[in-house]
Amino acid sequence: MFDLNRYQNNIAVITDSKDVFTYSDLHNMQAELFQHIGGRKLIAVLCENKIGALLGYICFINNQIVPMMLDKNINIELLNNLLNEYKPDYLWIPEENDYFTEYKVKCVLCGYKLIEYNNLNDITIFDQLALLLTTSGSTGSPKFVRISYENIISNTSAIISYLNISESEKAITVLPMSYTYGLSVINTHLYIGACIMLTDKKICDKEFWSFFNEFKGTSFSGVPYTYDLLRKMNFKALKVPSLRTMTQAGGKMSNDTSAYFYNYAINTNKTFYIMYGQTEATARISYLPFEYMSQKQGSIGIPVEGGSIELVDENNDKIREASIVGEIIYKGKNVSLGYALNRSDLEKGDENQGILYTGDLAYYDLDNFIFICGRKDSCVK
């Protein structure tokens, strides 16, 4: 999936402690880690925006190992519940984590350790299953979204296309790697041979922007709350000469805040993209082209390349007229395989067959741009 040899001389990662890793470095380190695993397994990963977590993710995806992506600060009771339900073969966790001292440590690399957790599984994992991500609404629940290799490649390619991501990009991490939007930033930049600036620092911290400017970052991504914070900080006064692109997803941004960042982008020769997606679609469903932002304020835009959107009424009939509200049905190769609640569900194949009922209600305007107005049973227009 990630062609580390093709981009071997490119800088892949810069950490906020100023460590620099090329794609060749990543290739060599992930090969070392893989030697300790040796086959298709399930691995629970406690993620943070550090080189160890990223290295593990690259190794697992590139070697047909399935990672369960979890935040490193997950509640221990919830973690134990998930481990009991999914029975992962290994854990890939920060070296300082001391919850699993009774288990064998197979290797330590880049501040992370590989723990042999459970070698008794006889359940076959579906051969197209690549990744398990929690859903936005499943905090406290064992529900994961089952994502395939095709899902990742399809969505990654579409995002690279509409954001015009090239090898020269340097994206700084704002969002958690265990969150579909945060992970999509990593996927797109690794896939094209670009650079990821890894930091766990908050976007409102002075050190975050010092790091961004020192290494000439070109983009950042955020949810509406991120942009509300930046606006309160008087972002327009911040000097970020290397910044090219800002992206937003993860919920509806207020019109005032979107106008603030649109005007900033226009006046400073940058671009700003508002996007819509769900974990069940691997990340992205639609985007609003920058040139339409002033005319189509509040819209989620148009479908990503390779995908299509239909609106259907209560009878599941397709809506063909403007301004009529219906549920968004998305179709594309990035639609996930389905859900999992436990280890045995990892045997399941593609239950969605490329069709996702999003539960979001929306309408078209006369130009076929889409405007969300709520969730099912709560839409007022």
Predicted segments with their positions:
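ATP-dependent adenylate-forming carboxylate-activation enzymes
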Residues: 47-48, 68-83, 194-215, 226, ...
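Conserved ATP-binding/catalytic segment of the ANL
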Residues: 320-323, 327-381
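Conserved AMP-binding/adenylate-forming
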Residues: 32-73, 174
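Conserved AMP-binding/adenylate-forming core of the ANL superfamily
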Residues: 9-37, 50, 77-80, 147-150
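Conserved AMP-binding/adenylation subdomain of ANL enzymes
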Residues: 153-170, 180-219, 304-306
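Conserved AMP-binding A3 loop
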Residues: 22-23, 130-157
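Conserved pre-ATP/AMP-binding loop-to-beta segment of ANL
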Residues: 6-8, 114-134, 141, 164-170
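Gly/Ser/Thr-rich phosphate-binding loop
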Residues: 217-222, 231-295, 308
